[in-house]
Amino acid sequence: MSELISSPLREVHQADAIPWMRERGRIDGACAVTSLPDVSEVNMDLAKWRTWFLGAVELVVNAVPDESAALFFQSDIKRDGAWIDKGAMVVRAAEDAGARVLFHKIVARRPPGMLTYGRPGFTHLIAVSRAMKCPEVLPLPDIITDAGELKWIRAMGVRAAGHAVRFAKEQVGAKVIFDPFCGVGTVPAVANALGLDAIGVELSRKRCEQSRALIVNQSEL
């Protein structure tokens, strides 16, 4: 008798991610792949958002086992003539939480050499862990030039998400991908496409429904 092969599972919880993570605690077998909301997406001034952001990074690191990893996609912003480096903020908060950087890659949002206005033309992809040691050689380019389709204006590209989830699966050995700010569900859908279970959290009811329904095919990755 042939064995039945079950499809990967997906849980999407409609909730505020901060109290949800505090209550849930560590998720066995999980690796986090996420993108924290920008100040423009939350009802806070810049100073309060900075504090919130740093605390959220620490909660994400706490949500996965020490030997696992947390991966962050973050795009810098400009405010009042100053550059807000979210990559530096992730590193600072992760180190304060007892983690260290495994790698820091760049995802191109625009073709290299093109002038950009407003938002920078690249996104940080940073992996951190408390105990994991990163392999010397990774099947992951330093600059990801094709991020893939964006399923939502604020979503990460599906190919970029695929790179992150493959790292979680092949290098970390994760069984579950956790995205506490899952939006319309790019990361959970990519995780399922690559054979992993996924847990997502999203405050918006509409985006929760989209996240539960979104399908990404392996051909898109």
Model-assigned labels for residue ranges:
Residues 2-208:
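Core catalytic lobe of class I
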Residues 216, 221:
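Conserved phosphoryl-transfer catalytic core
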Residues 211-212:
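Conserved SAM-binding loop
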